[in-house]
Amino acid sequence: MSSPTPFRWLRRPGPHTPPGEPGAYTPSGLSYGADYNPDQWPREVWDEDVRLMREAGVTVVSLAIFSWARIQPTEDTWDFAWLDDAMDLLHAHGITVDLATATASPPPWLTTKHPEVLPQTRTGETLWPGARQQWRPTSPVFREHALRLVERMAERYGDHPALVAWHVSNELGCHNVYDFSDDAAAAFRAWLRDRYTTLDALNAAWGTAFWSQRYSAWEQVLPPRLAASHPNPTQQLDFKRFSSDALRQYLRAEAEILRRVTPDVPVTTNFMVMGETKGMDYAAWADELDFVSNDHYVLPGPQALDELSFSANLTGGIARHRPWFLMEHSTSAVNWQPVNVAKKPGELARDSLTHVAHGADAVCYFQWRQSAAGAEKYHSGMVPHAGERSRLFRDVVALGATLRDLAPVAGSTQKPARAAIVFDWDSWWTSELDSHPTDRLRYRQEALDWYSAFLALGVRADVVPSATDLATYDVVVAPVLHVVPAGLRDRLTAFVEAGGHLVTTYFSGVVDQDDHAWLGGYPGALRDLLGIRVEEFAPLLDGESATVELAGEQLEGTVWTEPVDVVDPDVEVLGWYKTGEQAGRAAVTRRTVRTGDGTGAREGSAAYVSTRFGRQGLVPVLARLLDDAGVRSELPAAVRGDVELAVRTDGTDDFWFLVNRTARPVEVPDVAGDVLAGRRLTASGTSAVTTDGTAEGTAEAPVEGTAGGALLLEPRGVAVVRRPAAPTPPRKNPATAR
């Protein structure tokens, strides 16, 4: 186990464009740019590229991500001349470089000579060249060639004045996280030996007494390849853990070379915290990096903006609320969804600034210039096929100006909320395995629904990995926390006994770290803390539902119900099943936990939600639980749900990001502070605040820097206000908070 890497942001580059000129690198500012692929274009286009980059305010590009075949056209030949030229050209124009190690996709000569590097699927099929990322994470042959390239890149460019960071590979695991080859099998066995030491321990953990699976030699152990029936569930879970670790070990191998050759250059790689990308435990990977980077693409649907905010928030949690790098997102449509929807006016800036609101200090896109050929030619870029005379490029230039205005935000951290949602990769992986009570359960969707409910109520909530210290939070929501080892159970119990308020849901606490059921009734490890007992699950068929009455409202539960028995006198039933097989039984409960006496008395609680309410049904449930915990919205009642509030702080100032989630103007009353971006309403109308604090289009400029009054958020608009830092309120005891 490696120790966490200390946080380091972009290296300050060498001398170049004078500070303050458009496009100049400003160490204290937010970075702006894209993946840049000059090798796709004739040399004369490069000069136009840097001209347009300076016009847009680009300060950083990621370079050479898919350039292995260009850099090393054959096993024994190298061509760095074009890359030298590109690095020098960018540096001459004040544009810094996050330089990729170029190992993302092996060149054809390598896979032709060494087909043994190609991944294999669960059914034994080979993933052939012709796309990208066709390599086994555990292949010693691939690693030998890739690390040779990394060393050459580090030696050649480590001292280049444009270099500000190393970019390891690209989206590790996007297409090759699960490899079932013989290389993977050997590495899996080595990983299992390290984890369990003995076969007896492995047999016990995997429960191999079932179905005559007991192993008598390590060579008998295989990845969960295609089998006659459901593979062993703990074998599946361990293979997911191993696969994530194998990629992490590969990341570490590249990083070790880079740090040995160029110890002053920070190292990162781009995560993919978004949607159902779940094969990589990024909370564990973060310790390998100097700073976290992430790629995110909007997923169309009714929760598209919620999901964007959720993913940005979780990325901040993975980064321990330190600044992180948005390495990729899109200016408009992508190319890989069933229907690739173009962004509407205002969405380019709103989406980008939502990431900044949750801690991003760099905003970058895939890619700079939209490709003319290849699989991603219909994926938008900063310069579209239509060229610079397009609405999209004008929006790109406008966002660059806004990011320059937001320079004071750079280096600030996410201000802790009073509530948090716990996110756990083991529970995600395990709760969705086969041979379960239902295959309709979706872990991330349940977590997202709770986040949507927080947004609807206008209450800030952090999204944090399960290993996070929860002591600073008043309310912690842990949806479908399926895997609860004894240590996590004890942490949650201590949180509640210290006055915290825990909320968890159906199918939580059911198994330990080996996916073995906690015996004695559900919810297993959390049964005593919650003060309830469930004898068996009662999942619902498609089309079935159960009505629950809570606080006078009739709510619909789907997917899952449970016959909940209250076994502790301190449990209050907040919601009752009114229809279905569970009619008359408890559906939502809360146990009050009192510890200590006198001035040291604490009163916490542990609540349980036994059905799936969905994002809308959770709003009244969460409202009741937050009210009882004394957690309130910081937003005016009139804009809750329409506006998201995210807060960053540098200890002296807080930065309020107010995001208009609607397609209409929204007025936010009584917001004091300096307006860094957005519009303030004055007595004579709307004022557009510029970087020097004056207001355009009104006779009442300048606007007072610390003035109150209303903000007008344009449709899909974002305002940023700098205010004196407010102290984080201490946890409130509900006995005095009501």
Label each residue range with its predicted role.
Residues Q40-E55, A146-R152, M274-W285, K344-S352:
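Short, acidic/polar
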Residues M1-S62, P73, D88-A92, T96, ...:
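N-terminal carbohydrate-binding accessory modules
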Residues S28-L30, G57-T59, H91-V97, D159-V164, ...:
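Short, well-ordered coil/turn segments that N-cap beta-strands
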Residues V221, D264, N294-R738:
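Carbohydrate-binding surfaces of carbohydrate-active enzymes
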Residues S31-W41, A64-A81, W128-L147, L172-N176, ...:
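The substrate-binding groove and active-site-proximal loops of carbohydrate-active enzymes
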Residues T123-F291, D295-V298, P302-L308:
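Polysaccharide-binding and catalytic clefts of secreted carbohydrate-active enzymes
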Residues A34, M53, V61, L90, ...:
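Conserved, mostly hydrophobic/aromatic
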Residues E48-E55, S62-T126, A154, E254-V261, ...:
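Aromatic-lined substrate-binding rim segments of carbohydrate-active enzymes
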